[in-house]
A protein has these predicted regions:
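Charge-dense, helix-prone N-terminal extensions
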Residues: 1-109
Length: 109
């Protein structure tokens, strides 16, 4: 792991696009990953990655030092399923991206 956040994010994007029906796009102006139904499941935000996670992965990600619920407006209205995971835990970003992909792809919307 390089601790270069953008490089780490780009590596996750490359792997996800190569191994799953994933595209890159934008959400709230940030680069993100979307499944083949257009549902965003991960993104790059201010040198971190954010992930939309189900309960087990959500709790695991939130337990990391520096992790928190994603509040893009910074007005105390976090997106409860989304977790910010700092680059210090970038070695887990791909794993969480896979979990997030599975979560949004399997979730009945």
């Amino acid at each position: 792991m390089s601790l270069e956040p953008l490089s780490e994010y780009e590596a996750v994007v490359s792997e996800m696009v190569a191994t799953t029906p994933t595209t890159s796009g934008k959400m709230f102006g940030m680069p993100c990953l979307k499944n083949n139904n257009g549902k965003a499941f991960a993104g790059y935000f201010e040198g971190t990655m954010v992930f939309k996670l189900g309960s087990a992965s959500h709790a695991e990600a939130l337990a990391f030092l520096g992790a928190k619920l994603f509040d893009p407006s910074e007005r105390g209205r976090p997106m409860k399923e989304w977790v910010v995971v700092p680059v210090e835990h970038g070695s887990r970003w791909l794993e969480f991206a896979r979990d997030a992909f599975d979560y949004v792809t399997d979730k009945k919307m």
